[in-house]
Amino acid sequence: MLKNPFKKKSIADKYQTLIREINALESTVKTLTDGELRNKTNQLKQRYQDEQNLNNLIVESFALTREASYRTLGLRHFDVQLIGGLVLNGGKIAEMRTGEGKTLVATLPAYLNALTKKGVHIVTVNEYLASRDQTSMGQIYRFLGLETGLIQEKMTTPERQRNYKADITYVTNNELGFDYLRDNLALNIRDVFLRPFNYCIVDEVDSVLIDEALTPLIIANSVKTCVDKYIIASEITDYLELNVHFEIDEKNKSVLLTNQGTIQIEKILGVQDLYNPRDPWIPYVINAIRASSLFFRDVHYIVQNNRIVIVDEFTGRIMPDRRWRHGLHQAVEAKENVAIRQTTEITASITYQNFFLVYPKLSGMTGTAKTAEVEFDKIYSLPVEEIPTARPNLRQDLPDLIYKDEFSKWNAIAKECQNISLVKQPILIGTTTVEKSEMLAQLLQEYRLSHQILNAKPENVRRESEIVAQAGKKGSITIATNMAGRGTDIILGGNIQFKVRKDLYNILVTYKYQTKENKKDSLSRSLQIFPLLKKLQRTSQKFLTVLNCLINNKQFLNLSDVEVLKILNESELIRVPKISYQCSMKFLINELVNFEKKTQKLDNVIVKNLGGLYIIGTERNDSQRIDNQLRGRCGRQGDPGKSRFFLSVEDKLIRLFGDARLENVLKSQLLDDLPLESELVTKILDSAQKRVEERNYELRKNLFDYDDILNKQRNVVYYERRKVLESESARIKILAYGEQVISEITSKLRRKKVFGSQLISRIRNLLGTKFLLNFPSSDLNNLESIDFQTYLLQEFWLSYESKILELEVEYPGIIQEFERTLILIYMDREWKEHLQKMSLLRDAVGWRKYGQRNPLSEYKEDAYKLFKYRGIVTRHLVIYELLRSSIL
């Protein structure tokens, strides 16, 4: 039978040869001892040094990683996971469903690329995931002779440097981006954290490169803030009426004052012009209106410890280090009557779009990338490959139900939970904001339905892993804001490891305190407190013996409760503990797991028979990817599951982006409390969602186009800066600057027809009286411009060298440090000024389209002029400072 030449190759077909070769090598690798397996790493490193070709090492390195994983973690990579590893190594995005083992897949390309000795970064969206993955997967790398690093928020400079020097480093996108910016503000090479970039794997790549693309990373300095104006502007909003004094654009989160509004505000303030540049009120007023009408508590932010903390709309997590720009954050602080912090000016900034493009080799993994593959390809040159599942997907996505209003929708959700809870099927409800999660929790309470809630509130965040892990438990109801980057698998019947760790923690802490207080019969007391111990007394006497020994271990008794909890949490990740009390705790956990297994297996079967986890979405998100992230929480690894979205006509997506067809259908068919289930409505909603996604893509593309211009300039500045930072002496740079400055000064003065003694006087004023100019002024008028420049250059060199010699006698070695630091300080200062100007230019250039001019072309042209001017000013300031400084 002839093959169809037009049939598209499946991903399995693409990598079939390599998979076959890796599998063929498996039996050989299995015969190697642990030492021989470890020695293979050095052999592969040497082969790379000789051949400079990683492709020749793929088969052997993947086979070694698979075997090391089995020996350390008891986990063997499936063939589909090998495919995922090959996709990642090829500089692509691997789309893998929830529960398919992305964390394990990343070990394959990470180990391979670490053989270059240039370092590998594995980027996660939060510290919990980075720490968890480094602890568990680090065992594989260490077994193979590689070092792993972990970057955490409060690490010192030496700790960061040590961890970045590891072969494979786990780090959050936030920490990595800020460390890059800090490196490019360092005044001494000893303070630099990062080595040159090599290879990066981004977990939840769509969250980082798409959802956070519009939010730049910013390092800023505080500047003087007019607090009173923010407070007064906030109070003024109480006297303004929507659509009378101002209009809002909810889609773009913008505000427009009407003429009546302008007059009203000027009257209240007692000023003649809100736009007066000497005493401007307009930015304060606009931000105050935006804060009161478009930014809401427990939706866009929470108030924590008398501070405004932004909530990430895509992940539902708080972002304590982020602040809104251009005075908006201060306006929200004034609205909430909390302390108003100072405004800032940008010192350094970069978007994730441009930051990750610094890597020579980049790849990513996520459960939801296919819907954004055009953007990944056009902006990042990252193709998306869908990885097949190890088992068939049994999830059932039910049609949306749409209700007349929000009241009917929320009541329907509560009733659905009530009905489902009767059969004990677990339910996970996804909400879009903190406010709605709290409101639904209150509603379920009225229905007397027991539930767990996970949102950005600190008291809930602390229990995140446990809440998510137990969402598959029989009869559980869990309310959670968006599920991106939660990182914990939901196991049907409940997660036995989390239950066991919680039970054992309570037992150990109670038992420990009783022992410390020298209470007699602490065991019998514990048996009364914990019924679980009574059951174990009948089945495992060894458990109680080990428990008794542990409680009498002095090292263990000196541990804090937090340290006990940390050891318990890491016990699942560490297969072979090294400390005696860790061994005892590992044994106790294993005993409890074996004891609970029978019950958990039974619950697992029951929940599967009930249909698995039931996902309820309470609103369609702006992006289909976010909806798919929620749906993807059920049906993991061949489990059953179902999902359904409950919607209302008042939902944001329908209200802002629905079209006339949808409105007509809904008005004609919707009745009180009765939902509409229609394929047409679902298609119209999909279409509305697509329009929002296209609009957001255009926003990100537009940002990228503009930011690309600034990024090219940033790359030039950072390259020049690094050369100065790494140089032993900046003397050549100083001399080059001097030549350029003198050339620029003389050319400018001659254009202004300044000659003779007047020329000498002007140059002395500019460069300082110490500048040696002994040339007879009578001869100056007869000199050509180029000859005069040569003379000035010679005098500059002589003046500068004489000062250096004097300084070296008094302060040996200081001049080199001084030269280098001075250049860096002025580079940074002028770059900061340049960023302010570019920001103003970006805001202003948009108006030029009304003059039939292309804003992007205009921006590019003006940006070049500003950048050129920045270079001139930097050179002049450095030379002026060197020649006029008292240190010289």
Curated annotation (Swiss-Prot):
It is an enzyme of class 7 (translocase). The keyword Ion transport does not apply. ATP binds at Q81, G99, E100, G101, K102, T103, D489. SMART domains: SecA_DEAD, SecA_PP_bind. It comes from the Eukaryota. Coiled coil: none annotated. One of its GO terms (biological process) is protein import. GO terms for cellular component: chloroplast stroma; chloroplast thylakoid membrane. It catalyses: ATP + H2O + cellular proteinSide 1 = ADP + phosphate + cellular proteinSide 2. Its EC number is 7.4.2.8. One of its GO terms (molecular function) is ATP binding. It is found in: Plastid, Chloroplast stroma; Plastid, Chloroplast thylakoid membrane. It is a peripheral membrane protein. CDD domains: DEXDc_SecA, SF2_C_secA. Keywords: ATP-binding, Chloroplast, Membrane, Nucleotide-binding, Plastid, Protein transport, Thylakoid, Translocase, Translocation, Transport. Pfam families: P-loop_SecA, SecA_DEAD, SecA_PP_bind, SecA_SW. InterPro entries: Helicase_ATP-bd, P-loop_NTPase, SecA, SecA_CS, SecA_DEAD, SecA_motor_DEAD, SecA_preprotein_X-link_dom, SecA_SF2_C. Has a central role in coupling the hydrolysis of ATP to the transfer of proteins across the thylakoid membrane. NCBIfam families: secA (TIGR00963). Belongs to the SecA family. This is Protein translocase subunit SecA. It comes from Trieres chinensis.
